[in-house]
């Protein structure tokens, strides 16, 4: 172990070069920095800050430069593409409800040559991971306490570096597993129902939802094999102007749902579990509760969406939210929740609590309060229904989120089948046993059913969520959906629990494989590729856009005929 202790700055030599840490405005803070080696051979930077008094911690920055050798691409869980960026254009941030502090740098042969992971997955971190033009070096930076932070007297954290060449997918999984172990994260239970095909009201209905319409739609969904339903925004308001001005009272619109409990029961009688959407932080400016919580907001009008953002550092705010969900669960006997917009718990400038000396707040750190809130929600709901389903949406998909959510969904990407595929694969690598869901699928019914099937195939390595208006769908489209739902359930264990290998992230995974003891399933999403097929029973889902593809099996190359939008057993 190498250790350097200084008042304001520290440095240590790692296998890839020097790592430096420094503090600004230390004001009595002492910095300790040590290099350690993990049992698996990765290198760990341990950073400790101590102060004799309770004070706002100093801005702290870790930096390193690594020769750009073999590192042609970069990855993190919320990336839109994997292109390397210059250091001045490679900035991002993570916290409890934003992203994941894991970064992998790799080549075009699915080999990682350098990865970085930070233990801190609750508080705000700033990141840099880009190329410094002078010298063609990868510049790494991590910043702590650069946004408003509560006073503390001690802080300890670790950063993991892995400069060994290894498979890209293994590098991601190992980094995430290290965070979970080091940060003491215990993921919540994932019921089997979290992996059932799902129907969402959002893209097809938006806010214009009515009980009778939904029940008619879900009767069709049930026949096709869907098992879960999410009623999204609209059930709580008569307004259809988008925005969130009427959120926060959480009273059912009687015009839309005259008897919510009876409606839920009718849907459940179809064999479908019922989940409800809530925008967790929002209190609409036109809601009755807006005046009640004045003075207890961190943001007066989030992004101009007509809603203020609650401050969960107030215990009465957390109690209000927990009680709201518990009441819904008890009153309507629902099966789960889509808890939305928790990334909106953020400051629009300075922390308003500082001027008030944190009056009324039992927690001073906002990210820590968000973590406490979601833990209290999970504990309250599972005490009533242990198999409760809880969905969170990208980009709040970090390690801490898995403590309270068992369904992690791709962020909104309507009509973007490639983005759905890419994000599903990223989440699968980074989310352990959580059920990874596609963004809701929709397509134009003027498409051929074979072309519409491409949307489904691109999402098959996650739990597929559908949001097309089934009652208006041509019968050929319904038959296509039913066919693929059956395939997904016949091969569910392989698709969702098998060894998962997505290839070439720099190309957004043109080939994805899943393998179980009994079979291999391959998704082909690009033409002109030779697909390596093992001797084991193999299914290829063809979304290449071509009606044939080339395989290599047992050293022999041959062409296989299979319609695009279909699958074949080999």
Each language-model region and where it sits:
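Residues within well-ordered alpha-helices
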Residues: 217, 260-263, 455
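Active-site mouth loops of central-metabolism enzymes
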Residues: 200-212, 306-320, 441-448
């Amino acid at each position: 172990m190498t250790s350097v202790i200084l008042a304001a700055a520290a440095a240590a030599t790692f296998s890839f070069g020097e790592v430096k840490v420094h503090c600004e405005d230390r004001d009595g803070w002492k910095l300790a920095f040590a290099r350690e080696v993990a049992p698996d051979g990765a290198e760990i930077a341990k950073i400790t800050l101590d102060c004799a008094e309770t004070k706002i911690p100093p801005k702290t920055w870790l930096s390193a430069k690594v020769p750009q050798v073999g590192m042609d691409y970069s990855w993190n869980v919320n990336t839109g593409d994997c292109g390397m960026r210059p250091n001045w254009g490679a900035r991002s941030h993570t916290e409890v409800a934003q992203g994941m502090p894991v970064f992998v740098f790799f080549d075009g042969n699915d080999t990682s040559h350098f990865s970085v992971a930070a233990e801190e997955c609750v508080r705000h971190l700033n990141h840099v991971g880009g190329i410094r033009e002078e010298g063609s070096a990868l510049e790494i930076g991590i910043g702590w306490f650069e946004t408003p932070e509560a006073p503390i007297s001690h802080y300890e954290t670790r950063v993991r570096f892995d400069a060994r060449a290894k498979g890209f997918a293994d590098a991601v999984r190992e980094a995430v597993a290290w965070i979970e172990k080091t940060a003491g994260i215990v993921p919540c239970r994932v019921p089997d129902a979290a992996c059932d095909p799902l129907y969402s009201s959002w893209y097809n209905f938006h806010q214009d939802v009515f009980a009778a319409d939904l029940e008619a739609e879900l009767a069709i969904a049930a026949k096709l094999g869907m098992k879960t339903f999410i009623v999204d925004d609209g059930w709580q308001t008569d307004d259809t102007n988008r925005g969130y001005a009427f959120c926060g009272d959480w009273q059912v619109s009687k015009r839309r749902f005259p008897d919510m409990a009876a409606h839920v029961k009718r849907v459940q009688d179809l064999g479908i579990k019922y989940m409800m959407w809530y925008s967790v932080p929002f209190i609409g400016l036109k809601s009755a509760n807006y005046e009640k919580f004045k003075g207890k907001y961190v943001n007066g009008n989030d992004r101009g969406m007509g809603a203020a953002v609650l401050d969960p550092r107030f215990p009465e705010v957390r109690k209000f939210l927990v009680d709201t969900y518990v009441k819904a669960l008890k009153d309507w006997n629902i099966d789960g929740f889509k808890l939305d917009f928790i990334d909106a718990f953020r400051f629009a400038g300075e922390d308003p609590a500082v001027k008030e000396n944190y009056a009324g707040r039992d927690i001073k750190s906002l990210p820590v309060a968000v973590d406490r809130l979601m833990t209290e929600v999970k504990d309250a709901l599972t005490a009533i229904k242990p198999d409760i389903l809880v969905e969170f949406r990208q980009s709040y998909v970090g390690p801490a989120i898995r403590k309270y959510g068992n369904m992690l969904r791709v962020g909104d990407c309507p009509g973007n089948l490639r983005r759905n595929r890419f994000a599903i694969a990223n989440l699968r690598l980074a989310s352990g046993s959580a059920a990874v869901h596609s963004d809701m699928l929709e397509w134009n019914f003027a498409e051929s059913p074979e072309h519409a099937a491409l949307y489904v195939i691109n999402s098959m390595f996650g739990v597929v969520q559908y949001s097309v208006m089934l009652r208006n769908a041509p019968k050929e489209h319904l038959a296509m959906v039913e066919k693929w739902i059956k395939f997904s359930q016949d091969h569910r264990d392989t698709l969702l629990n098998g060894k998962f290998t997505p290839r070439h992230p720099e190309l957004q995974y043109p080939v994805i494989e899943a393998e179980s003891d009994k079979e291999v399933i391959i998704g082909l999403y690009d033409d002109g590729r030779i697909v390596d097929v093992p001797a084991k029973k193999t299914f290829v889902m063809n979304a290449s856009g071509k009606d044939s593809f080339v395989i290599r099996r047992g050293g022999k190359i041959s062409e296989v005929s299979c319609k695009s939008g279909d699958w074949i057993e080999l």
